[in-house]
């Protein structure tokens, strides 16, 4: 893939990419990035892990998600911008 390639022109570089959203609380989300608005980050087909503060639980959740795909619990989810600590591509979490 070309660096800086935008999946859909006029959208963010992450548009359509499966991402991991780490929050300032105990939640972790994995879903397809759509956009960020004043309301927050909009994801589609979202898996959610509560109590993600436990590193072993988080790593296991991400390992299984990477291996078997996103088990969507939400069709759409908006994570408020103030609760977003970091957004990264799911492929960056591949340890295998």
Q: How would you label these PLM feature ranges?
A:
Residues 2-96:
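Conserved RNA-binding domains used in RNP assembly and mRNA/RNA metabolism
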């Amino acid at each position: 893939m070309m660096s800086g390639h935008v999946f859909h022109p006029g959208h963010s570089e992450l548009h359509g990419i499966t991402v991991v959203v780490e929050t300032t609380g105990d939640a972790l989300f994995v879903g397809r990035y759509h956009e960020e608005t004043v309301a927050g980050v909009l994801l589609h087909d979202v898996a959610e892990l509560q109590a993600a503060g436990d590193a072993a639980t988080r790593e296991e959740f991400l390992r299984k998600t990477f291996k078997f795909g996103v088990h969507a619990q939400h069709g759409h989810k908006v994570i408020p911008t103030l609760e977003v600590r970091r957004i990264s591509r799911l492929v960056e979490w591949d340890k295998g």
